[in-house]
Regions:
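Hydrophobic/aromatic-rich transmembrane helices and adjacent perimembrane loops
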Residues: 383, 402, 407-445
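Membrane-embedded helix bundles of polyisoprenyl
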Residues: 37-41, 84-87, 128-147, 152-239, ...
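Start-transfer (signal-anchor) and selected internal transmembrane alpha helices
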Residues: 1-50, 59, 155, 298-329, ...
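Alpha-helical transmembrane segments at the extracellular/periplasmic loop-to-helix junctions
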Residues: 287-304, 321-401
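Loop-to-helix entry region of an early transmembrane alpha helix in multi-pass inner-membrane enzymes
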Residues: 92-106, 115-139, 172-176, 180
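Extracytoplasmic
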Residues: 2-17, 35-38, 56, 61, ...
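Transmembrane signal-anchor helices characteristic of membrane glycosylation enzymes that use polyprenol
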Residues: 21-61, 66-67, 73-80, 89, ...
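Short hydrophobic/aromatic helix or loop-helix immediately within or flanking a transmembrane segment
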Residues: 63, 67-71, 85-119, 215
Length: 791
């Protein structure tokens, strides 16, 4: 007996030691996997900095840098008192503390103080900041998933976080904005709140709310996170009621839920109230409706359960089921009413009701609807695993993730930018699904191969995003982006050549660049806080020349106007000559006395895309939405509103609409139909391209592709443009090489030509500048940015 007892004890000790060894080994594997994931994540996020340079990316991050610098110089207190910045939204100025929130500035400064001993200044620190915090998200995602799933799923979540395209898109070095920090904090806060359901609800409730509370100081999408926590509380209460109906425990402590959620409700309210942008009045807004319902539900259910027990609680709630159902219907029905009275508006309304979008909201690329192609590029390789995870998310601790996944997927469809918001839920669900499928031995190898293939494809998608250059490097071009120093050259010129207090009018996309890099007051920027001023700028650009000049000089009090339009010269590509798209030869136009087509170089607007010509559609739409028939107060006829609303008055927008067409090969070009507006006069007059003659002079006269081919009469000296079909006939271009179909020109040719209003019929100037508008700057190297002075 004693011998047997000793033997059993020895075996137990050996088993315990073996288990301890396995645990230690597994801990080492997990630690190594997390370290490798973090290293890979940081490398991916900093690669574009190493390759393209230490640039702050896009537009919004520049104001974040500017305000971080201001905070470093003046302290944090101005965020809670306000400060006036006269160089933005000239001539009115703006108080940024009431428009933006301090979180981004603060996390940038945290990295600055960390790296300052190593010689980093603030600029370089804020370039590193988003990459560092976003890479650290591999640890918070591991923690989040480990709260409701096993460690294998948590490690997979960390790995997916390192390479996920949606994490990378707004987590690169230089993308100093709100998303990078939110993707780090949101899973941390949610994980801590889930932990609060299990133990120590006060401690974990405070920690979780602090993490999510800082999101309220960082990103406007905090309204979603705020309501997500409230909705998750409601879902957990509903789950508890269903379990009570079955006579079983809910599987979590309703006491812990009541305590932790009450802490969340009031502590988050403190974060929300502290900043000037929101303030205490936000707690009385519609955005606090679901969180307040959550508070009533969790506290009410806990008190009911504590007093009368599970079974009687269920019977009591069953009596009032119709009241609860009616409340849900009432909330849904109230949304359009609240939208009508502007209680919910702007991009927040566009998220809830995608069809309730103003022209300004629609004009922002990241507020457009998501597409199937974009969603595949973001999550395609892991969608099967996300679907496979859903049965595993029915446990109480995973219900917040399921709620996040369902609601986040809806918001991601309504706006492209919100594909990023759902990233933690999508990555966590994919990791859980992958781990669950790998447990099925029958499909083990097949699932493993599928997982490896998905990870490889995910990595390829992420790497493609990681290698793309910053917006300032490609001068804000797209489709495809082309590296160019045009905007950098233009901003340096503004900073050094314009009078010190000269304001510059521009479309709102470039306002931050003009003020922060160009050091000159701008009239509008990406904050889009003054729709009337944006509408006025749009109206000035899309009005007849003299009216537009008067609006800029008298109403907006500026005398410098910047415009941006990328364009390509086809004579730079020898292969296009065979298609008649450029020629260094003189071509006699048949037997017409003295008429010859001259050597020419064809210019194509908006290739690469991204300029003001494309955006002019939205300039007109916003101007019409802001003013309508009130354009009459600017000296325009009231009927001009109809002209603004109808793109065929000035702009050919697409192939599905009835109207003129212009096709090169199989590519439809967007072309102007009216050169009499101020913007089109600025963009398409030939003075802006004369500088290129030193490069392209062997090819003859530059000509916009929609104008036709320049021709002159050697006897009379008359000049004109001839339609492309006329040129093809006399230049003997083979039919298979006649790639231009349709034509816009000065002289209508039945069935082929569509006349352009304002196109010069007796010269090669296309359109001429008025005497009170002077071209003072053309950017290098491509001439994409121009600045005019109103004299």
């Amino acid at each position: 007996m004693a011998l047997t007892g000793k033997s059993s004890s020895a075996q137990g000790a050996q088993t315990s030691a073996s288990a301890g060894g396995r645990d230690l080994l597994w801990t080492g594997v997990v630690a190594s996997a997390l370290a490798a994931s973090f290293a890979m994540a940081l490398y991916f996020r900093m690669y574009r900095v190493f390759y393209w340079g230490w640039w702050i990316d896009e537009f919004d991050p520049y104001i974040r840098y500017y305000l971080a610098l201001y905070t470093l110089q003046h302290g944090i207190s101005w965020w809670f008192k306000g400060a006036y910045f006269p160089d933005f939204w000239y001539p009115w100025g703006v108080d940024w503390a009431r428009v933006l929130i301090p979180g981004v500035s603060l996390y940038g400064l945290s990295v600055y103080f960390l790296l300052r001993p190593f010689g980093f200044d603030l600029w370089h620190a804020v370039v590193v900041a988003p990459a560092l915090y976003n890479a650290l998200a591999v640890f918070t995602m591991y923690y989040f998933v480990s709260r409701f799933s096993d460690k294998k799923a948590a490690v997979l979540a960390a790995l997916l976080t390192a390479i996920a395209p949606t994490y990378l898109q707004r987590g690169f070095g230089g993308w100093f904005d709100d998303e990078a920090l939110t993707l780090f904090l949101a899973p941390l806060g949610l994980g801590l709140l889930i932990e609060a359901l299990k133990k120590r609800p006060v401690l974990y409730g405070v920690l979780g709310t602090t993490a999510i509370g800082f999101v309220a100081w960082t990103w406007g999408a905090q309204f979603y996170i705020w309501n997500l926590v409230g909705l998750s509380a409601l879902v957990l209460v509903a789950y508890a009621v269903l379990r009570a109906a079955q006579g079983t425990s809910p599987g979590f402590s309703t006491r812990n839920l009541a305590i932790s959620y009450t802490i969340f409700y009031f502590l988050f309210a403190a974060f929300e109230s502290a900043v000037l942008r929101y303030g205490p009045h936000m707690l009385r807004s519609i955005y606090n409706f679901i969180p307040t319902l959550g508070l009533l539900a969790v506290v009410g259910y806990y008190l009911l359960e504590a007093r009368v027990g599970l079974a009687r609680s269920y019977r009591f709630l069953k009596r009032f089921a119709w009241v609860i159902a009616a409340a849900v219907v009432l909330v849904a029905a109230s949304i359009p009413v609240l939208a009508y009275f502007h209680v919910i508006s702007g991009k927040f309304l566009a998220t809830i009701l995608p069809f309730g979008r103003s022209a300004i909201v629609q004009s922002v690329a990241e507020h457009t609807y998501s597409t199937f192609q974009l969603e595949l590029g973001s999550y395609g390789p892991v969608i099967p695993f996300i679907i496979a995870s859903i049965p595993s998310l029915a446990s109480p601790y995973a219900l917040p993730l399921l709620t996040y996944l369902v609601t986040g997927s809806y918001t991601a469809v309504t706006q492209v930018r919100l594909l990023i918001l759902v990233a933690p839920a999508a990555v966590a669900a994919a990791a859980v699904g992958m781990a669950q499928l790998l447990k099925i031995r029958r499909f083990g190898w097949a699932v493993a191969l599928m997982a490896i293939a998905s990870l490889a494809l995910f990595t390829a998608l992420g790497w493609g995003t990681a290698t793309s250059p910053q917006q300032i490097v490609v001068s804000a071009t797209a489709g495809p982006s082309v590296p160019s120093a045009d905007w950098l050259d233009a901003l340096m010129w503004m900073a050094t050549r314009l009078p010190p207090n000269a304001s510059v009018a521009e479309w709102w996309d470039y306002g931050y660049w003009v003020t922060i890099l160009g050091h000159r007051p701008s009239l509008a920027d990406n904050s889009t806080i003054n729709s009337t001023q944006i509408g006025t700028i749009g109206l000035a650009f899309m009005s007849p020349v003299e009216t537009g000049i008067n609006i800029f000089s008298k109403d907006l009090k500026t005398h410098y106007i910047a415009a941006f339009m990328p364009w390509s010269a086809l004579c730079a590509y020898p292969g296009y000559s065979q298609f008649g798209l450029w020629s260094s030869q003189i071509v006699q136009l048949g037997n017409a006395t003295g008429w010859f087509a001259l050597p020419f170089c064809t210019l194509v607007p908006e290739i690469p895309a991204g300029g003001d010509f494309l955006k002019s559609y939205w300039m007109a739409q916003i101007a019409n939405q802001v003013y309508g028939t009130d354009v009459a107060k600017f000296g325009l006829p009231a009927s001009y509103a109809q002209h603004l609303a109808n793109p065929f008055g000035y702009f050919f927008t697409g192939t599905s609409q009835i109207g003129p067409y212009f096709v090169v090969g199989n590519q439809f070009l967007i072309v102007p139909l009216n050169l009499t507006t101020l913007l089109y006069t600025m963009l398409f007059n030939m003075e802006r391209v004369y500088w290129m003659w030193t490069t392209y002079s062997p090819y003859g006269y530059p000509t916009w592709i929609f104008a036709g081919v320049p021709a002159a009469n050697i006897l009379t000296g008359n000049e004109t443009y001839v339609p492309w079909d006329v040129y093809y006939a006399y230049a003997k271009i083979p039919p298979q090489n006649q790639v231009i179909l349709g034509s816009l020109c000065t002289v209508s040719s039945a069935g082929f030509c569509y006349p352009i209003a304002g196109l010069n019929a007796t010269g090669f100037a296309a359109t001429s500048l008025p005497p009170n508008l002077r071209l003072v700057y053309v950017s290098k190297p491509y001439g994409w940015v121009v600045v005019y002075q109103i004299t």
